[in-house]
From Swiss-Prot:
GO molecular function (one): metal ion binding
Sequence similarity: Belongs to the fluoride channel Fluc/FEX (TC 1.A.43) family.
Pfam family, one: CRCB
Native source organism of the sequence: Brucella anthropi (strain ATCC 49188 / DSM 6882 / CCUG 24695 / JCM 21032 / LMG 3331 / NBRC 15819 / NCTC 12168 / Alc 37) (Ochrobactrum anthropi)
HAMAP family: FluC
Name under which the protein is recorded: Fluoride-specific ion channel FluC
Listed transmembrane segments: 5-25, 35-55, 68-88, 100-120
Alphabetical UniProt keywords: Cell inner membrane, Cell membrane, Ion channel, Ion transport, Membrane, Metal-binding, Sodium, Transmembrane, Transmembrane helix, Transport
UniProt xrefs under InterPro entries: FluC (IPR003691)
Amino acid sequence: MQATLMVALGGAIGSVARYWLALLMLPISRELPWGTIVINIAGSFAISFFGALTLEQGRFPIPEIWRLAFMVGVCGGFTTFSSFSLQTMDLLRAGQPGKALFNIGFSVVLCLIAVWLGLLAAERFNGGIEQVAQNVIEEEAS
């Protein structure tokens, strides 16, 4: 029950942060959903960086409940894959397949790069990218 409450609290924080950032990005989001793109890239970096640093074997290990609160709650509430999907479909339905493909490619590639950069940044704290990657794999398997 405590974990559920922590995830819910994290989700509320992430959702509000997403809303505020999307509002800040509105002036430049006329042609493409830049707020959603930036949010997904930032969330991809945050989940990998925080996740790698806070593993039991990481530089800053923390209790699992706090990892859940941030990774499932905050990052889950903050990132916007459903919004990304809907906005891409809206571009397609508006007869703008080029913009839709750009949105897909740009978002996916930069989110993958953000995850990679998050892992590299965590490497500085944890002592080697191979160890970070192995720790993440082991954590996911358990």
